[in-house]
Amino acid sequence: MNRTKIDKLITDYPLVKNLINLEEVTWFNPQATTLEKGLPYVGLSQQDVADAEARLQRFAPYLCQAFPETQKTKGIIESDIVAIPTMQNALQQRYGVAITGRLLLKKDSHLPISGSIKARGGIYEVLTHAEKLALQAGLLQETDDYSKLFSDDFRQFFRQYRIAVGSTGNLGMSIGIMSAKLGFSVSVHMSADAREWKKRKLREHGVNVVEYAQDYGVAVAQGRKQAESDPNCFFIDDENSPTLFLGYSVAGDRLKQQFAEQQIVVDENHPLFVYLPCGVGGGPGGVAFGLKLAFGDHVHCIFAEPTHSPCMLLGVYTGLHDGIAVQDIGIDNITAADGLAVGRASGFVGRAMEHLLDGFYTLSDAEMYDLLGLLNQYEGIRLEPSALAGMPGPARVSSSLDYLEQNHFSVEKMRNATHLVWATGGGMVPVEEMEKYLATAKI
């Protein structure tokens, strides 16, 4: 994009200047509307989410066998919610703003199998593909006990098929580990940002890791290209996959059940704010969709991105979606938040969800590292940098008086509010790597 075009973009959309300057920004979305009005844009329904949940239930006996760590949840891949009151006090002091209500952490960082939110969508799409192949071959019926898939016969069957994906790390981990376990031959095309330990772990599972010196977009494009020339190769498209999206969306109803068990109320007078780190958008988009179906207009989803990779904010704010990349306006897309190092957002997710998201904000790498250190210090919870992106959210909302006023969030309602920070990864980070993260925190 030349200087004239960038200047025109700034004139039309002034916040672009702040993004170019790598400033931390908060933007509340004027297009946000009710579930009733916003839902038709998604093109998916409650029934689609119910079908996804049913499929995961069918596969639960298989997952119990293949991954013994899932046995305590009976083969269902789900994470805990924990209260983090000491961190809440630390955030109030750090940002100089009162954060009323309760602050909770959703520990997708500690999901079994791959230790990140991607264990939801990535694993679900692999299972969907495996089921389809086995059904078509007459080897499986939906009424069967799916633990039969954990056998040499099925591994032999799946070995003739290939799976490919492009990833900055976590999606590749979940798809690679799951595909290899089933017996597929799998290639993960990894961008320059991907951490060495993630590549190493994948190779230990027998995954073919293809490395690129360029960013996420190139890795995805190359993965797609490889799959196109091979009729037996299935490409999992993080940028445009409704199946991945649905794998994430089952989180909504499950969260509702967890809240019911913990007697956490969400209604008109008890709003729920959920802060989701965003890369290409599939994970947070799918989760936000599920949350909207579960809690309706009482849940308010806000996406968080690094200052160096604000692709979804840029796409939704300008209305250009995947028609613009952060590199087009001179932003380098280089961030320590490797899971969020994406320059061009998913057009599918942006267009599907732009009417159902309350807002977006950015934060610096230094801020993520400091919050990583604080969470470890005050709550003893260790996450990877990108998983901390949601942590400033409660302070951003609490200090945005116009947003609170427009939405009639009175002092009383905010006192009854629940703030949920979605921790997206970090449970499988090697100790020596985590020590480096903690050493980077300036607290």
Curated annotation (Swiss-Prot):
PROSITE patterns: DEHYDRATASE_SER_THR. It catalyses: D-serine = pyruvate + NH4(+). One of its GO terms (molecular function) is pyridoxal phosphate binding. It comes from the Bacteria. Its cofactor is pyridoxal 5'-phosphate. One of its GO terms (biological process) is isoleucine biosynthetic process. The keyword Lyase applies. Belongs to the serine/threonine dehydratase family. DsdA subfamily. This is D-serine dehydratase. It comes from Yersinia enterocolitica serotype O:8 / biotype 1B (strain NCTC 13174 / 8081).
